[in-house]
């Protein structure tokens, strides 16, 4: 037992000390295997599938088998039965009687205004909605993991910037200290350098905290238990993506977005409910067949089933003449619900269309901004090197050095934040166009 415990602690220790590199696809696959919300969504699909199977009961006949037996006891009594033919008198004594019966009945709905058929159609639409909601859940999991992953990558990169900034500040303090001791610079230069180094230390502590929080968030979104284990997001170069045109985006939005398809399915539900309400005014026809037999005991019952059985066939037709205002009210309510679903669909589609257009424009904007930011970083790096050389020979002030250092930090941070925002917007566009979850479909899901 102690050996197993030591092995377990060793595994935790190794996992916490050795950072594991993951790309975003690996993190998403782990989340799709572990996240409990996907299990719940799958159960909803299975429940809807069972509802579809149950809806066929309205179209199929019902078969019932019944059997009964009974025995009645009462005080002994003699019954005198005169035989007028033979001029004799018979007596019968009895104190109990028994009864046994068996029957088979088949009932079938012939017509009920299309209610049974429409109930099946409604169950099919409900199953489709459950599958679309499962897609929604999967998309949300992928979005959360992607956002957390790039949040971790951003925190890693900003931590690297903070480390470089602190290193530059320490070197600057050492340089100013030597020059101050030689009398080449004033004490205010040394104080300014120390202030800059102190600010760099504070920034580094904040970045470490942000990195730890991002790590925890990613583990939670991946559905993993956080034991303090390290994880490293792989740094990859940002590559501009192709942005669909407005017409292409609208087409994908209508055909692929799960929420849009759910709204469209709701309209179909409204149509079916209206047909059901309308069919309630139609006559209903039912038919049944009954086969039965009875006897005083099991032997007589067997004989009756062979020779003395009874067969009954019946058919009933119901005409709904008047039922208050219930039928007309139900029909009007179904009609209003149908109009509401149609209005909700158009409103929802227009809202998403605007969102897609805004994201399209922002991604196109990022594709122009990021190269400019990259050039700015390169220029800031070169500027800092030149100012440091000038300061070392006394042709630049400490303020110029600090300004160049701050400019480099800001340009690096701006580039990191801009690339992060661009990746998040690209992910959001894929999600809105219904393409995000399709990228991570399993072979079984593709077959379905």
Predicted regions and their residues:
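Periplasmic alpha-helical coiled-coil/stalk elements that build and connect Gram-negative outer-membrane
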Residues: 22, 26, 50, 134, ...
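Small/polar, glycine/serine/threonine/aspartate-rich low-complexity segments that form flexible
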Residues: 66-105, 234-243, 275, 288-319, ...
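Bacterial Sec-pathway N-terminal export signals of envelope proteins
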Residues: 19-68, 74, 226-268, 321, ...
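Sec-dependent N-terminal signal peptides
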Residues: 4-15
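Acidic, low-complexity, intrinsically disordered peripheral segments
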Residues: 64, 73, 414-448
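A glycine-/polar-enriched beta->alpha junction
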Residues: 29-39, 46-61, 96, 103-122, ...
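Amphipathic alpha-helical coiled-coil segments
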Residues: 40-55, 137, 141-160, 171, ...
């Amino acid at each position: 037992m102690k050996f197993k415990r030591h092995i377990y602690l060793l595994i935790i220790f190794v996992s916490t000390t050795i950072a594991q590199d993951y790309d975003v696809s690996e993190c998403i696959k782990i989340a799709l295997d572990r996240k409990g919300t996907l299990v719940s969504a799958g159960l909803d699909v299975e429940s809807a599938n069972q509802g579809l199977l149950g809806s066929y009961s309205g179209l199929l006949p019902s078969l019932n088998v019944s059997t009964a037996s009974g025995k009645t006891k009462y005080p002994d009594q003699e019954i005198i039965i005169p035989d007028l033919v033979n001029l004799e008198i018979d007596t019968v004594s009895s104190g109990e009687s028994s009864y046994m019966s068996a029957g088979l009945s088949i009932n079938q709905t012939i017509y009920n205004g299309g209610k049974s058929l429409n109930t099946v159609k409604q169950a099919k639409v409900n199953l489709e909605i459950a599958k679309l909601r499962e897609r929604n859940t999967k998309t949300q999991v992928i979005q959360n993991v992607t956002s957390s992953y790039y949040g971790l990558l951003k925190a890693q990169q900003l931590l690297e910037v903070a480390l470089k900034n602190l290193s530059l500040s320490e070197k600057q303090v050492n340089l100013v200290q030597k020059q101050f001791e030689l009398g080449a610079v004033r004490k205010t230069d040394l104080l300014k350098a120390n202030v800059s180094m102190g600010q760099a230390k504070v920034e580094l502590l904040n970045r470490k905290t942000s990195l730890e929080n991002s790590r925890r968030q990613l583990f939670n979104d991946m559905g993993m238990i956080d034991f303090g284990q390290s994880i490293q997001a792989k740094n990859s170069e940002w590559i501009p993506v192709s942005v669909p045109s407005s017409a292409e985006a609208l087409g994908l939005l209508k055909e692929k977005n799960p929420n849009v398809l759910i709204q469209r399915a709701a309209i179909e539900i409204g149509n079916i409910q209206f047909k059901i309400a309308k069919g309630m005014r139609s006559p209903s026809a039912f038919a049944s067949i009954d086969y039965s037999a009875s006897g005083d005991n099991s032997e007589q019952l067997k004989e009756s089933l062979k020779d003395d059985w009874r067969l009954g066939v019946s058919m009933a037709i119901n005409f709904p003449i008047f039922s208050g205002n219930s039928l007309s009210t139900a029909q009007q309510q179904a009609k209003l619900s149908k109009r509401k679903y149609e209005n909700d669909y158009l409103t929802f589609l227009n809202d998403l269309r605007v969102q897609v257009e805004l994201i399209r424009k922002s991604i196109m904007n990022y594709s122009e901004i990021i190269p400019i930011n990259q050039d700015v970083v390169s220029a800031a790096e070169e500027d800092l090197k030149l100012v440091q050389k000038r300061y070392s020979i006394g042709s630049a002030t400490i303020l110029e050095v600090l300004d160049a250092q701050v400019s480099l930090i800001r340009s690096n941070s701006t580039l990191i934040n801009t690339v992060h925002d661009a990746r998040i917007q690209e992910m959001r566009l894929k999600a809105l166009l219904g393409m995000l979850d399709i990228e991570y479909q399993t072979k079984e899901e593709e077959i379905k």
